[in-house]
C-alpha cells in the first residue's frame, strides 16, 4: 500500500505501558489477641479477603492505580489477625485507543502490581507470628466486569424512569 505519493504509510506507534513508580500507600496488620492467637487453633481459621482497584489520572497519559486488599482470619470465637494494604503504582500509557484505556488501567495495571502486594501481605502475616498468607491469583478481568455491572445497575437505579 502507498499513501498516494508512492511512499508507504507510516505505521501507528505501538501502545506503551510503563511503570514509573510502585509504593505502599498504607499498610496495617493487627494481631489483637496475641499471644493467645499464636497458639495452635483447634480448626483452620476462616480467611476472608476483599480486593478493590481504584485509579485516577495524574497528568496526561499518567495514572495512579491503587490495589486495595483487606483480609481477616477468624477462629471459632475471635479475630486471629487482620490486615489492610493499599499498594499503588504510577503508569504512563501512550498510543492506546480511548476505548481500551479504562480496561487497561483497571485490569492490566493491577495485574502488574499484584505480585508485589502479595509478597508484602505474606511478609506482614509471617512477621505477625503466623505462616505466610499466600493469596491466590486474582481474576482482574472478572473483577472489572463485576464492578462495571454494579456501576451500571447503580446508574440505572439512580436514573428516573
UniProtKB/Swiss-Prot annotation:
MF annotations from Gene Ontology: unfolded protein binding
Signal peptide: none
InterPro entries hit by this protein: SecB (IPR003708), SecB-like_sf (IPR035958)
Keyword tags: Chaperone, Cytoplasm, Protein transport, Translocation, Transport
TM region positions: none
One example of a Gene Ontology biological process annotation: protein transport
Gene3D superfamilies: SecB-like
Subcellular location(s) per record: Cytoplasm
Cellular component terms per the entry's GO annotation: cytoplasm
Matches recorded under Pfam families: SecB
Assembly behavior: Homotetramer, a dimer of dimers. One homotetramer interacts with 1 SecA dimer.
Family per similarity comment: Belongs to the SecB family.
NCBIfam families, per the entry: PRK05751.1-3, secB
Function of the molecule: One of the proteins required for the normal export of preproteins out of the cell cytoplasm. It is a molecular chaperone that binds to a subset of precursor proteins, maintaining them in a translocation-competent state. It also specifically binds to its receptor SecA.
Protein name according to UniProt: Protein-export protein SecB
